[in-house]
Amino acid sequence: MLVEKRVGDVAYEVNPARPCALALDDNLYELLGESDEVSIDNLMDALIERAGKPRPLSLMWHMTRRCNFACPFCFIRDNSFDGDPTFDSVLPLLERIISLGLVRATLSGGECLLVKDFPSIYRYLKESGVLVTIFTNGSLIDGGVLNLFSELPPFSVEITFYDDDFESRPYRAALSLRNLGIDVLGKFTVSREKAALLHSVERWCALHDIPFLFDPVLFNGENGIDAESQAVNGEALVDLNVRRFGVGYGDENVVCTPLRSLQCKAADRAVFLSPELELSICHDMKRRWATAGKGFDEAYRLMRLWIEELKDVPIEGCSGCIDRPLCNMCTARSELIESPHGTRICVPEGHCREVATLGEKMRRRIREQKGDMR
């Protein structure tokens, strides 16, 4: 059964029994340029353009702080957390977000499959025409989860691997999902303890035609775990980042202008829900708005007022440089300083120096690899 999704005067239909099967109406098809292939990103751009105002089209939801793993670099794990959502408790919130045009949702944690009502919540999202991506460690993907995903396939499943036991459930789950026709992305968080496993995990993914990403960036969260102390550094970090960004990194012909606040697409079309059901733009943004008691509409209204106040404000300390891809600075990662003249948005002290130093080491390493000793 197809589910109609409507935003303003445009509509499309979704088949919940497929990972991503959309049928666009004539207005939306024309707006997208009559392309044979339409990305979800382009679809959301078109919906925002047609609506003429921001809409919560994309949801990232950290459903729980609990996890069945004990990684020493986790930014969110807190197994004392007792606020896992129940289907009945979050239904009004989800109904409202969906009614405003929600296109896709990403369910994460902690480990989202620990949530008792995960199947009911997932089924409701899918049967409402939402495209759902799952972030998981894969260890809880059993026969029941596979049956659910076979009936109502997710848009994609991203499994983060933490060891090289290729007979363990996470790896077997990745193969089972792929055999169901579900897109699987293998991921690996590079810490000092686990760095030696990167190559073998990457080879396994390549052998089984599973796309793979790794990330050496660790950051501290709100759970008291000093994740950053586990990060790879020195020459090993240089080598990892050269692999991540490629030998074209730091092209000196690239022009980067100074950053301004909230220029990302997320500011107009994304919402984030914390495990406590607090609303924000993304998980990096520390400013949150409670939905409990006030409901989604009031929290979203207050968030939009804050965004409009700070949108396009210069980020102080950023002059624009060729290390922008490595820098990853944005409003969420900046320091917000209240002053009599309003909120100042500033690059944290020492950030630019740290990024520039790493960027120059990367360019030097790339020149060495190319045999250019300038």
Regions found by a protein language model. Give the residues of each.
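N-terminal pre-core extensions flanking Radical SAM catalytic domains
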Residues: 1-81, 98, 371-374
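Iron-sulfur (Fe-S) cluster-binding segments and ferredoxin-like electron-carrier domains
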Residues: 76-85, 286-291, 324-364
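C-terminal accessory region of radical SAM enzymes
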Residues: 228-258, 278-329, 335-337, 366-369
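Short cysteine clusters
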Residues: 67, 71-74, 264, 282, ...
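Short, small/polar residue-rich loop motifs at catalytic or cofactor-binding pockets
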Residues: 8, 264-268
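Short Fe-S-cluster ligation motifs
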Residues: 93-114, 346-374
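Hydrophobic "anchor" residues
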Residues: 21, 271, 278-279
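Radical SAM/AdoMet-radical enzyme domain recognition
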Residues: 76, 80, 87-219
